[in-house]
Design a protein with these regions (language model features):
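Residue(s) in the substrate-gating loop at a strand-loop-helix junction
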Residues: 55
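Active-site helix of classical SDR
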Residues: 35, 71, 79
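Alpha-helical segment proximal to the catalytic Tyr-Lys
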Residues: 40, 84-88, 145
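Short, small/polar-rich loop/turn modules that mediate ligand/substrate recognition or access, typified
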Residues: 87, 92, 147-149, 155
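Substrate-binding pocket helix/loop in short-chain dehydrogenase/reductase
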Residues: 11-12, 19-24, 106, 117
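Active-site loop immediately N-terminal to the catalytic Tyr-X3-Lys motif
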Residues: 10-13, 60-66, 88-89, 124, ...
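A conserved structural motif in NAD(P)-dependent oxidoreductases
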Residues: 121-132, 143
Length: 161
């Protein structure tokens, strides 16, 4: 499960190369490196589950997050391409795209910003880490053995594919 992720938000024209690279290297290059290590083991076993945690920002974009959005969109493309490469060896590769989840990062948002975000979520609330974890558990299970190359959206309806 590739779940590492950082943000270093800034408007595009103010974003430094360091802010761009730190986010891309952690979120996308880190996924590449970890997956490369575990894929070799999975190939030998002829079975595996690779689950990448992307973000609604990779699908919808988000002002001040060109680096983060690009890294998470890249992760979804990585997921689809790798699923095509590894599927013949009984290895599934999927991603989960959480929306706004109740975390330390969302706790510090100003109340007006939280209300604005929630107005875009048909279910009218933030998601929980347990709801994302339940989706991970499903993708890791035998019940998901015919699911590969897809992104599951866990966002209360904020984005509907």
């Amino acid at each position: 499960i590739n779940n590492a992720g950082i943000t270093k938000d800034n408007l595009f024209l103010r974003m430094s190369d360091e802010e761009w690279l730190d986010v891309i290297n952690t979120n996308l290059t880190g996924t590449f490196r970890v997956t490369k290590l575990v894929a070799k083991i999975m190939l030998k076993a002829r079975w595996g589950r690779i689950i990448n945690i992307s973000s609604i920002s990779g699908i919808m974009g988000n002002q001040g997050q060109t680096n983060y959005s690009a890294s998470k969109a890249g992760m979804d493309g990585f997921t689809r391409s790798l699923a095509k490469e590894l599927g013949a060896r009984n290895i599934t590769v999927n991603s989960i795209s959480p929306g706004f989840i109740e975390t330390d990062m969302t706790h510090v948002l100003p109340e007006a910003q939280k209300e604005s975000l929630l107005s875009q979520v048909p279910l009218g609330r933030l998601g929980s880490a347990e709801e994302v974890a339940g989706t991970v558990a499903f993708l890791a299970s035998e019940e998901a053995s015919y699911v590969t190359g897809t992104t599951l959206h866990v966002n209360g309806g904020m984005y509907m594919a």
